[in-house]
């Protein structure tokens, strides 16, 4: 199975530029942020409710608790919310004040007011990547980028496994890219003296 493309910074900016030209730019940036900054899958993004993300006072929660029906593995899971993601979610709440006061409403909504299915999320990612001229990118690109970048920054693979919500370490390891440059940097870390 071919893995989803990891975006360069320039490619990510290109996609954001395409999104910014869309009517629902804040909503779509939020969808991308959930993937790129929390590693959420399309089904998890589609399953989020307003109350999963915002407290009763409207503040962004620092941990999301996903119910079993919202996850791939059908188990309750938690997602740590980074400051970058909190910032985007706060902007979303500010932009869609009335919507984000309804705790049971789907977090992301269509132009018709209903929530998204996982397939709709997949299709939106695909449409924005296509408009940005990116081949090989999918709704899973943000998740793969999230996990790969954590590995590149030296985060322990067990920590990445927990953040990915994978049962098996071998699943997490498939997400983490390596190349000759990374291998060379790794061996240069050794000092014996």
Residue ranges, per PLM feature:
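C-terminal catalytic core of Y-nucleophile DNA break-rejoin enzymes
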Residues: 2, 70-90, 104-124
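C-terminal secondary-structure termini that scaffold catalytic or DNA-interacting sites
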Residues: 2-6, 192-193
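Basic, Lys/Arg- and aromatic-enriched nucleic-acid-binding interface segment
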Residues: 9-38, 42, 100
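Short basic/aromatic active-site micro-motif
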Residues: 28, 135-153
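Active-site-proximal segment of tyrosine recombinases
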Residues: 44-46, 137, 147, 155-166
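Conserved tyrosine-mediated DNA breakage-rejoining catalytic core shared by Y-recombinases
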Residues: 47-76, 83-85
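A short, basic/aromatic helix-end/turn motif that makes direct DNA contacts
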Residues: 47-54, 161-167, 176-177
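Catalytic-site neighborhood detector that most strongly recognizes the C-terminal catalytic loop/helix
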Residues: 70, 166, 170-189
């Amino acid at each position: 199975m071919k893995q989803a493309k990891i975006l360069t910074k320039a490619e990510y900016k290109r996609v954001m530029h395409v999104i910014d030209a869309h009517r629902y730019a804040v909503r779509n940036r939020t969808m991308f942020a959930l993937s790129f900054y929390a590693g959420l899958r399309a089904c998890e993004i589609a399953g989020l409710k307003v109350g999963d993300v915002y407290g009763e006072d409207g503040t962004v929660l620092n941990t999301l608790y996903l119910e079993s029906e919202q996850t791939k593995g059908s188990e309750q899971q938690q997602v740590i919310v980074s400051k970058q993601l909190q910032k985007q979610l706060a902007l979303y709440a500010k932009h869609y004040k009335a919507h984000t006061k309804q705790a049971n409403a789907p977090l992301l909504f269509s132009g018709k007011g209903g929530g998204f299915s996982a397939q709709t999320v997949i299709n939106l990612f695909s449409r924005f990547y296509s408009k940005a001229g990116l081949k090989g990118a999918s709704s899973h690109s943000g998740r793969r980028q999230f996990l790969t970048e954590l590995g590149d920054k030296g985060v322990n693979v067990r920590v990445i496994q927990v953040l990915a919500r994978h049962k098996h370490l071998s699943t997490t390891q498939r997400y983490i890219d390596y190349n000759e440059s990374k291998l060379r940097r790794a061996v240069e870390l050794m000092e014996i003296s």
